[in-house]
Amino acid sequence: MATNFKSLLPVIDISPLVVKCDDANMAEDAGVAEVVGKLDRACRDAGFFYVIGHGISEDFIRKVRVMSHQFFELPYEEKLKIKITPAAGYRGYQRIGLNLTNGKQDMHEAIDCYKEFKQGKHGDIGKVMEGANQWPENPQEYKELMEEYIKLCIDLSRNILRGISLALGGSPYEFEGKMLTDPFWIMRILGYPGVNQENVIGCGAHTDYGLLSLINQDDDKTALQVRDLAGDWIPVIPIPGSFVCNIGDMLKILSNGVYESTLHRVINNSPRYRVCVGFFYETNFDAAVEPLDIFKEKYPGKGTSQVFKRVVYGEHLVHKLQTTFQNLVEHS
C-alpha cells in the first residue's frame, strides 16, 4: 500500500468493464480505462473498495441476506442437522465460537461451502476437503438461491480480475492462462449475534488468503473494519446494492507485491443480529502461486530484493482450515 486511506473507501462503478468483459480489446475503451485506473489506485492505496454497476440486482442481493437471516433464526437443533465436521470436508454449519482467528474464538456462526470436486482429483491434499456442500431444508429453495448467487459471484469476480490484470499492465486474461483454468471458490454465510457490550470480536483481524473477496453485508449495521497504515481501524459503512471487494494473499503474490492484502476484522456493536455473505474467488486448487513473469519484469520486487515464496494454493487452504478449526479437529 503506497498511501494512507482516505476518509472513505473508493466507490467504483464497473459497468463499463461489465459491458466489455469478453472483448479482447477492452483496454482501448475509454470507460474501461477509467475503471482500470480506479481499480489500480484502490488496490494500491487500500486493498478495499466498493463495487457498484456490477449487474446483480439489489433485490437479489438483499434476498440472499434475508433468507440467510431466516436460517440463523432456526432452533439450534435444526441448524445442527448440517453440522460441520472434518469427515464432511469442513462443509456445513459451525456454531458460535468454533471458528478461531489468531487462536481466539470468533463470535459468529456460519455455513461454510466450497467448490465441490471429484474424489481423488486433488490427491492427498484435497482428500480432507472432499464431500458435498450441506444445505438446510429450511428455508425452502435456499440451496437454489445460493447456487445461483455463486454463479453470479464467479462471473463478477472474473470480470473484476480482468480489470485488475489490465491495471497491472498485463492482458485482460493474464491470470486466466495458468492459474484460473478451474478456479476454486469459497462461500461463508456468516451470522453475528447482537451484543450488549462494546468491542466483542465477531471475527478477529486477518487477511484473506485467496485472490478476491466479495462481501454482501446488511445495509443497516456497520461492523466490518479495515486497518489503515497508521494502525487505525476504519469502518466500512454499508452502501445498499454494492459489494465490498478486497484483494487477498494470492493476488499479492501473483502481482509481485504491487498490491497488498489488508488486515480487516468484524466487530458488531449493534444489539441486532447481522448477516454477511462472503464469496472468495481463488486460483485453481492445485495452482503453484508465485509472481507471474510479466509482473516480475514490470515490478521487480518493487525496487527491493523481496522475493515471494512459491505457494501451492490447496496446501495453503487446507493448513488454514485445520488451524481455524483446531478445536473441531482435536475433538473429531
Swiss-Prot record:
GO cellular component, as recorded: cytosol
Cofactor note: Binds 1 Fe(2+) ion per subunit.
Catalytic activity, reaction form: L-homoarginine + 2-oxoglutarate + O2 = 6-hydroxy-L-homoarginine + succinate + CO2
Signal peptide residues on this chain, from the entry's feature table: none
SUPFAM superfamilies: Clavaminate synthase-like
Keyword field contains Calcium: no
EC id: 1.14.11.-
Disruption phenotype: Plants missing 2ODDC23.1, 2ODDC23.2 and 2ODDC23.3 produce reduced guanidine content.
Family matches, as PANTHER family: 2-OXOGLUTARATE (2OG) AND FE(II)-DEPENDENT OXYGENASE SUPERFAMILY PROTEIN-RELATED (PTHR47990)
Annotated protein name in UniProt: Homoarginine-6-hydroxylase 2-ODD-C23.3
Organism field: Arabidopsis thaliana
Taxonomic placement: Eukaryota, Viridiplantae, Streptophyta, Embryophyta, Tracheophyta
Gene that this sequence comes from: 2ODDC23.3
